[in-house]
Amino acid sequence: SKFPALPDPEACSVPMVALGGISPATIDLCRQAGFYGVATLGYIWEKPEEALSRYIRLKTPFVLSIAGFDPSSGAGVTADLKTFETTGSYGLGVCSAITFQHEDSYTGTHWTTPEEIQRQCELLFQKHNPEFVKIGLVENFEVLDQLINYLIQKFPRLKIIWDPILKASAGHIFHENNTLQLNRILPRLFLITPNTEELYQLFGDSAELTRLQKIARTYRLNILWK
C-alpha cells in the first residue's frame, strides 16, 4: 500500500471515508484499501464530469457468485451474472463445479476443489471487495462450511447468501442434509433462498411458516421462500 499508516477499515464499527488529497490516481487505491467512500474537495470542481463518472464507478457494488457452470445458462454462475447486471451491480464469478446438462437432461458434475475455489477468490480479492456473496452449488456441506469460514475471515462484515442447490432442475440430487453442519452454517449467513422442496429437505417437518419464523429468529437469518 502507498498509505504510510493505513487503518484497518474492517476493524472499525462504522464506515470509514478517505479525506484529503483525493484524485483520480488515489480513488481506486482507497477502494482497494477497504474505505467505504472518499470525500473529494478541490478536484471535483476542476473536472466535474470526470469526477462524477468516477464516483458512479466507485459506488457500483461488487457482488460475487460462487456457483456451478451450467452450459445452458439456465442456472449457476452465468445466470447470476446476468441477474446482477440488471440490478446495476458489477458481478464477479467463481466456478465451484462444471455440470454436464441442458434444460432437460443431466449427465454429470466435475467438482472444483476447495483450494481451486479459494485460488479464484484470492485473485479477485486483490482487486475487488464484494459487499455480497451468493453461494450456489457446492460439493457438500463440509465444503460450504470451509468456504463460509474463509469468506468471513477475509471480510468480517460480508453478507453471505446461500441458494441451497440440493437437486438439479433435470432431477439429479447432489447431496443430502447434515443437521449438525447445518446448525453451524446458518448463524453465519445473511439470507437463504430455498424453494419449497429444499425447505423440507433442510428442515423436515419444521418447514411451516411459524416454525420457519422461529428458525429465522434463532439464527438471526433471513429466509426467502421461493
Regions inferred by a protein language model and the residue ranges of each:
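Glycine-rich phosphate-binding active-site loops on the catalytic face of alpha/beta enzymes
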Residues: 1-5, 27-58, 92-100
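Short beta-strand/loop segments at the ligand-binding rim of alpha/beta enzyme cores
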Residues: 10-19, 61, 157-160
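Glycine-rich beta-to-alpha transition loops that act as phosphate-gripper elements at the mouths
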Residues: 14-25, 76
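Hydrophobic faces of well-ordered beta-strands that scaffold small-molecule active sites
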Residues: 16-20, 38-40, 91-93, 160-162, ...
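Structural motif
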Residues: 32-34, 87, 218
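Conserved N-terminal subdomain of the carbohydrate kinase-like
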Residues: 60-65, 81-169
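Short, glycine-rich nucleotide/cofactor-binding loops
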Residues: 66-74
